[in-house]
């Protein structure tokens, strides 16, 4: 599956083409990164997944370096979102070292693990 990507740098909004979630894969629909008022960056991530209940749902997403070697933060999702698709959750004040200009967001589900598709977003002011 190919996901079309367009990056709008002015608002640091990453929009990904809406495609139906493949069974088991979490689709990252949108990522917004903004400078936090208390330092670091705030992230809003919208996910689409065919949650079926407590044994199969999108259970977290994380912010890492583009090469995947540095971990910056994680948003744990504590319950399924069967009737709320896509859904958006936030992670605030993520500290990212100076010099890092963009990060990768990847999503996970309880049954299949990490989704193949990731999203890369530019950090505002970097």
Language-model-derived ranges and their functions:
Residues 72-102, 108-113:
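Short, solvent-exposed, Trp/other aromatic-anchored flexible loops in extracytoplasmic proteins
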Residues 1-8:
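Bacterial N-terminal signal peptides that target proteins for export
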Residues 56-82:
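The feature marks short-to-medium sequence segments in extracytoplasmic or secretory-pathway proteins
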Residues 18-23:
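Sec/Tat signal peptide C-region and signal peptidase I cleavage site
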Residues 24-61:
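Short, surface-exposed binding/anchoring microloops in extracellular/periplasmic proteins
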Residues 62-67, 88-90, 117:
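Residues lining hydrophobic/aromatic ligand-binding pockets adjacent to catalytic sites
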Residues 116-126:
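Short beta-strand elements
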Residues 9-17:
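Bacterial N-terminal signal peptides
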